[in-house]
Amino acid sequence: KIYSTKPTLSLAEVILNNTTRILREEFELEFDKSMISNYKEETLDIIPMIMKRCDYNEKVFLSEVFNENISFEFFDAGHILGSASVLINAGGKKIFYTGDINLRNQTLIPKAELPKHKIDILITESTNCAADNYPDYKEETGRLAAFINRVINKGGSVLIPSFALGKSQELLMRVHTLMKKNIIIVLIVTCIITA
């Protein structure tokens, strides 16, 4: 079984099909062509059948998999739609695992939820783990508005490269809000998604 949050399962079909296409193209160009058979679209058809949707904060018991009393629950990681950290209860210990996590509210995604009780082991990605100098949301939005206005007032065009999932939607919402509040002029916004 594959356990996931409901939003992740909803996005999985699109993301997995895209990933499969990219991997097939890369293998055709750079690797042993016999490996391509591992990345067939038909293989993806079984994924929805083996995925189990879980709500955030829903305790899921894995007794059918393990003979021991092992459970887990997802916590919203506040990173992108469907992102989750996981609290695993096993052998009387609490293990909290998280990848990317955001401890501040975004325009579209609320900040991460964390367990309210003591954990025994923390496993985390650490790109910004010890950073305490994150830019202020309002200051960064102000800098974005000033940049856009400066470029547009000089007759230029604004190009903002961004990840297709999560960050693009956040940027579009910020730009929309800035236009709605007349902080920046109304722009023609074009999104180009490339793989």
What is each stretch, according to the model?
Residues 1-170, 176-181, 188, 192:
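His/Asp/Glu-rich metal-coordinating catalytic cores
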Residues 195:
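Ligand-binding beta-strand-loop-alpha-helix segment within the catalytic cores
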